[in-house]
């Protein structure tokens, strides 16, 4: 029996509708709109697509977005100066710097410069540390979105074995903390992991984010596993967007699976909107 498809598009749509309703109520009550600063450095086509998607979502749900389209030649000092001004701007609740950055700019310096209460990407060490201590505030958008996808299956995650393929700071590491918080037994695998298939064959939940098209095969999976594909790649031959999981073979083995596109991607944007609302509400309470 083929797996049930977890539609990130549908779930993200509902989340954004809920956010829009809350924002509309704040406006009726006389409050300002939430403000999100979006910074793009350089002209990377993929980054431009991602930024446009985020700004479109802001417009749809009532968040005021302030866009900074900066040249790739901007210095790190100049970028840090812009961030410091935004940190002090009371009309800005969230600051997003689209990655990747040019090689001469250290992304760690940029992430750490953003005020932790405006870090709507959830990358600041303070927010990562809060998640590790089981008291999350602003959470990493992709892993937060994956948890919402898992919740939609209505399966009790406590005690399940989750295997993460990929140990990046953006996906793998925060994903592990989220799953631990949900009571899972977590295994993180990466490029140096031996016997990857042995790990995957015992996994109740498989989450893959490594940037290799169609890497994980269905025959590697446990029957009935929940498969979440975070990858998004352009297939060399078909030119279509594909994930890190070989969808056709995995669909035959899994109980639930996310498609690419239309799975994790929309959820990442939706949780960015959720984080912006959360930061906005925090700032309103602090006034």
UniProtKB/Swiss-Prot annotation:
Single Gene Ontology MF annotation: methylenetetrahydrofolate dehydrogenase (NADP+) activity
Ligand binding (NADP(+)): 166-168, 191, 232
This enzyme's EC code(s): 1.5.1.5, 3.5.4.9
Gene Ontology biological-process entries: L-histidine biosynthetic process; methionine biosynthetic process; purine nucleotide biosynthetic process; tetrahydrofolate interconversion
Disulfide bonds: none
Catalytic activity, reaction form: (6R)-5,10-methylene-5,6,7,8-tetrahydrofolate + NADP(+) = (6R)-5,10-methenyltetrahydrofolate + NADPH; (6R)-5,10-methenyltetrahydrofolate + H2O = (6R)-10-formyltetrahydrofolate + H(+)
Annotated keywords: Amino-acid biosynthesis, Histidine biosynthesis, Hydrolase, Methionine biosynthesis, Multifunctional enzyme, NADP, One-carbon metabolism, Oxidoreductase, Purine biosynthesis
Gene3D superfamilies listed in its UniProt record: Leucine Dehydrogenase, chain A, domain 1, NAD(P)-binding Rossmann-like Domain
Domain of life: Bacteria
Pathway(s) served: One-carbon metabolism; tetrahydrofolate interconversion
An example Gene Ontology CC term for this record: cytosol
Role: Catalyzes the oxidation of 5,10-methylenetetrahydrofolate to 5,10-methenyltetrahydrofolate and then the hydrolysis of 5,10-methenyltetrahydrofolate to 10-formyltetrahydrofolate.
Assembly mode: Homodimer.
Stated family: Belongs to the tetrahydrofolate dehydrogenase/cyclohydrolase family.
Protein name, entry field: Bifunctional protein FolD
Organism: Haemophilus ducreyi (strain 35000HP / ATCC 700724)
Lineage summary: Bacteria, Pseudomonadati, Pseudomonadota, Gammaproteobacteria, Pasteurellales
Gene label: folD
